[in-house]
Amino acid sequence: MPLLDSFKVDHTRMKAPAVRIAKTMTTPKGDNITVFDLRFCIPNKEILSPKGIHTLEHLFAGFMRDHLNGTEVEIIDISPMGCRTGFYMSLIGTPNEQQVADAWLASMRDVLLVKDQAQIPELNAFQCGTYTEHSLAEAQQIAHNVLERGVSVNKNEDLLLDEQLLSL
């Protein structure tokens, strides 16, 4: 089985919260696709709560589009990582890390402005697979933590995994 790009970086050296360009590609028609690693937590030291990350997923996707989409950028998808330390964001375009960090911080401020659970989008049995597993308070705590700590940049060249460690 081929080794995925996300497992070629040393998770023990990742900063968080931090933005990383995880992958870039060009489609046959010439569109640039960029995948960002939006790391909320330091891997193996912190983790996002299930209800918090789920609520954040519902809020973050819309808020990031509000702050980042434009004539040169269109978000395709924002999805939580299985390890619950962050999100992957795939988009058309090539915004830089600072543009993404600024949109992320603005989105976290928006999360703090949500007044109650009734304002969480798609919070119903028809649009959400586990609509009872949400916590606005936990999502807002995550947002507060990001704003308090700020968002830095993780560079792939600083995180390259030593090939000797790949066989462990």
UniProtKB/Swiss-Prot annotation:
Q: Which cofactor does it need?
A: Fe cation
Q: Reaction catalysed by this chain?
A: S-(5-deoxy-D-ribos-5-yl)-L-homocysteine = (S)-4,5-dihydroxypentane-2,3-dione + L-homocysteine
- GO annotations under biological process? quorum sensing
InterPro entries per UniProt: LuxS_sf, Metalloenz_LuxS/M16, S-ribosylhomocysteinase
- Assembly with partners or alone: Homodimer.
Report the sequence similarity comment from the record. Answer: Belongs to the LuxS family.
The identity of this protein, by name, is: S-ribosylhomocysteine lyase
Q: Which organism is it from?
A: Pasteurella multocida (strain Pm70)
